[in-house]
Amino acid sequence: MSLKAISAKDAASLDKDLMEMGGWSLDQLMELAGLSVSQAGMWSIYRLHPPSAGKNVLVVCGPGNNGGDGLVAARHLAQYGYTPSVYYPKEGKNELYQRLKTQLHNLSVPFVPDFTEALKSADFLVDAIFGFSFGGPLREPFPSIISQIESSSVPVLSVDAPSSWDIQSGPPKEGPGSKFMPKALISLTAPKPCVKYYRGRHFVGGRFLTKSIVEKYGLNCPDYPGIDQIVEVGVDAEGRL
């Protein structure tokens, strides 16, 4: 099944429609997104890498909603039996993010101050730094962080787009992120155009869209198995979903 990719502008408009006309709150959308991220992490690592084989998941969060999705995912991963830690160098100012932090503190999920040291002990990494609204350029500390992720052998799950990638044109031609190819990618709601440059395990999470939203944006949602919130869709050698 071929899936339609949506632009950053349409993705932002879709989120606005969900909240203004659909009755959804930002909290709800972030919870569903974070749940999808955690399930993609489970699919990517649990069947081949259960908690008994290595529990340490490093969740790297940016200052926006993509980072909030990462905070939610970290909570779910803790409940699944993993040992997540969070690197959150530039915290978002929205009060929602502070509540998510409190939830993690109550589960004794640590917020680590040193990314380089945390990466050394990570078995898996969730890249929740930048999402569909990223427009560049990268600002510190993120160029250094992305360079370290890029050169590490730790498997990575990126949220909505590999951080540093342009949503339309994919990886930068040079500098941090130019060779960044995470092991897995979870597209939230619908794939973004940059996915045609991606090679790896590709998941979609958006099992909450109404018929009216699907029709308005011309989406063709995949069939989700059972009660799963995500589905693996892949990308072929020609960049087609």
Swiss-Prot record:
It is found in: Cytoplasm; Mitochondrion. One of its GO terms (cellular component) is mitochondrion. Its EC number is 5.1.99.6. Binds 1 potassium ion per subunit. Keywords: Cytoplasm, Isomerase, Metal-binding, Mitochondrion, NAD, NADP, Nucleotide-binding, Potassium. Pfam families: YjeF_N (PF03853). Its main location: cytoplasm. It comes from the Eukaryota. Residues 11-221 form the YjeF N-terminal domain. It is an enzyme of class 5 (isomerase). SUPFAM superfamilies: YjeF N-terminal domain-like. The keyword Transferase does not apply. The keyword Metal-binding applies. (6S)-NADPHX binds at N65, N66, G67, G68, D69, G131, F132, S133, F134, G135, G136, P137, D160. K(+) binds at N66, D127, S163. Disulfide bonds: none annotated. It catalyses: (6R)-NADHX = (6S)-NADHX; (6R)-NADPHX = (6S)-NADPHX. Its cofactor is K(+). GO terms for molecular function: metal ion binding; NAD(P)HX epimerase activity; nucleotide binding. Catalyzes the epimerization of the S- and R-forms of NAD(P)HX, a damaged form of NAD(P)H that is a result of enzymatic or heat-dependent hydration. This is a prerequisite for the S-specific NAD(P)H-hydrate dehydratase to allow the repair of both epimers of NAD(P)HX. Belongs to the NnrE/AIBP family. HAMAP family: NADHX_epimerase. This is NAD(P)H-hydrate epimerase. It comes from Aspergillus fumigatus (strain ATCC MYA-4609 / CBS 101355 / FGSC A1100 / Af293).
